[in-house]
């Protein structure tokens, strides 16, 4: 039998992932900071999912961006439906901690969101982010359109040049289209740093400026 530690640096294979559940976790559907819904159709708005380490600090990065309509934290990219936080932390779901960003692309460009993403964490660290270790902290961009996917790949290549010049290694960010199912996390984790202003935030960027989104 595999121990939890076996999944700190690799994703579970088919048959190894936890089974999860059919029913979604309970969710209070109002954003604590801006009052907008966390879940809905979001007609006329764009969506993307970002993984950049612990989702508590990652969500705050994006709810502070003008033009972002709402944000929510959850689990994505893995195999276990409607996983719980403890299940994700075991490494046996395959999910990364993710932020759903719903935005008005007339008010904020996708390039600007990509710049926030790249500059807010170290995308070269593989299955960890800072002191947070495990597959659930891996860097990821889950795109909802082909245009987003193409832009994400181009931004990765542009930022890689800057990181290489600064002495960093290869970007390990997982970039996917179409986006996998986003499973909303428990209520306690939504807008966590608004509820707990002095709460833990392990995010730290590289200090290397991303060359995209400057004029977008």
UniProtKB/Swiss-Prot annotation:
Task: Name one process (GO BP) from the record.
Answer: cellular response to oxidative stress
Q: What is its EC number?
A: 1.8.4.11
Query: Would the keyword Ribonucleoprotein turn up in this protein's UniProt record?
Result: no
Catalysed reactions, semicolon-separated: L-methionyl-[protein] + [thioredoxin]-disulfide + H2O = L-methionyl-(S)-S-oxide-[protein] + [thioredoxin]-dithiol; [thioredoxin]-disulfide + L-methionine + H2O = L-methionine (S)-S-oxide + [thioredoxin]-dithiol
Q: Which UniProt keywords apply?
A: Oxidoreductase
* Entries under Pfam families matching the protein: PMSR (PF01625)
- InterPro entries, alphabetized: Met_Sox_Rdtase_MsrA_dom (IPR002569), Met_Sox_Rdtase_MsrA_sf (IPR036509), MsrA_MetSO_reductase (IPR050162)
**Active site per the UniProt annotation:** 54
* Keyword Oxidoreductase on entry: yes
Q: Which family is this protein grouped under?
A: Belongs to the MsrA Met sulfoxide reductase family.
What does this protein do, in the record's words?
Has an important function as a repair enzyme for proteins that have been inactivated by oxidation. Catalyzes the reversible oxidation-reduction of methionine sulfoxide in proteins to methionine.
Name the record gives this protein: Peptide methionine sulfoxide reductase MsrA
* Organism of provenance: Xanthomonas axonopodis pv. citri (strain 306)
Highest lineage ranks of the organism?
Answer: Bacteria, Pseudomonadati, Pseudomonadota, Gammaproteobacteria, Lysobacterales
What gene is this protein translated from? msrA
């Amino acid at each position: 039998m595999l121990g939890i530690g076996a999944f700190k640096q690799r994703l579970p294979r088919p048959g190894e992932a936890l089974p999860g559940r059919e029913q979604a976790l309970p969710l209070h559907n109002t954003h604590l900071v801006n009052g907008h819904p966390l879940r809905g159709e979001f007609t006329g708005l764009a969506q993307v999912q970002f993984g950049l380490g612990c989702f508590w600090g990652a969500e705050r990065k994006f709810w502070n961006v003008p033009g972002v309509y709402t944000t929510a934290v959850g689990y994505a990219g893995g195999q276990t439906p409607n996983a719980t936080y403890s299940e994700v932390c075991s490494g046996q779901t395959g999910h990364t901690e993710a932020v759903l960003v719903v935005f008005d692309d007339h008010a904020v460009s996708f390039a600007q969101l990509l710049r926030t993403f790249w500059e807010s964490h170290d995308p070269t660290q593989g299955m960890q982010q800072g002191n947070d270790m495990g597959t659930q902290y891996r860097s990821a961009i889950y795109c909802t359109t082909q245009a987003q996917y193409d832009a994400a790949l181009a931004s990765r290549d542009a930022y890689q040049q800057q990181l290489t010049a600064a002495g960093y290694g290869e970007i390990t960010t997982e970039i996917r289209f179409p986006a996998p199912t986003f499973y909303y996390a428990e209520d306690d984790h939504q807008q966590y740093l608004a509820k707990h202003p002095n709460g833990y935030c392990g995010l730290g960027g590289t200090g290397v400026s991303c060359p995209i989104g400057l004029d977008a």
